[in-house]
Amino acid sequence: TGKMIWYYQTTPHDINGHEPARSIILANATIDGVEKKVIMASTKGDYAYILDAATGELIHEPISFGAQKINIYNSNKGNDADFLLSQEVIVDQTYCPGAFGGSSTTSAFADNILFVASQNYCTKFTKGQVIYKDQLIDGYQIETTQEAQSSSVHAIDVSTGQIKWTFPIESRYQGGITVSSGVVYLVDISGNFYALDSETGEVLKKIPMNGAGNAAVTIASDANGDMRIFVATGGSKSGIIAALGLPVVDSSEDDEGISRRGLIGSLVLTSIVGILYLLFIRYYRN
């Protein structure tokens, strides 16, 4: 019919810019032993929402994750939100998560676990001149604070709404999350590639790719039908796409797709890619 069935507003009268970003997932999940179709979303304000897809009702209370929340207004307030607030209340104030999140990238879901990434990143809100229709007018500006910036990845048990584990990352994280066969794949803005155990968060592999990671790792087959892990990095440096080979799984062993042991062995190829990349950069700069 084209008519709205339901809606759920995460942050009424949002003055911090903490909307859900690219993170909405529709999937079947097990809740209290019963399979149910759910909607999962995370916001730039570092809250995760798990909703009944049929009704829009919350299955769990909003799940808070990430670093501390400072000068944040109207998150999870519903009809109790202060609709008279203006952005004047945060002028000359530092607020966290900042204007860019928080959780601002694509999340992932597998084996009843929701994986979300959060940037521990604050911004300051000030008044100033901004360009509007080729003219300078009075407006608001966002400034980056001088504090160290880091990130964290969180695994949330969808059946309970509890955080299973948290993995800290030393730099900002703007790429999406990929999960396959019990392995979580990440690449941060400093170019570090990670493979984590999806159940425990244990690091299976960490490889420097020497370029900013701003996109999710992709798993697909090449023209020959061989499975590959594709890692894109670049930023201000020359960009590359590294194609990493996956191991052939012996059918006599457990049939879990990409085995962790095989993963660790196969990703040795990445070291070769990294060395060749460094040689290329040195040659290019000279």
What spans do the regions from the language model cover?
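Extracytoplasmic/lumenal domain signature
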Residues: 1-20, 25-37, 41-103, 108-174, ...
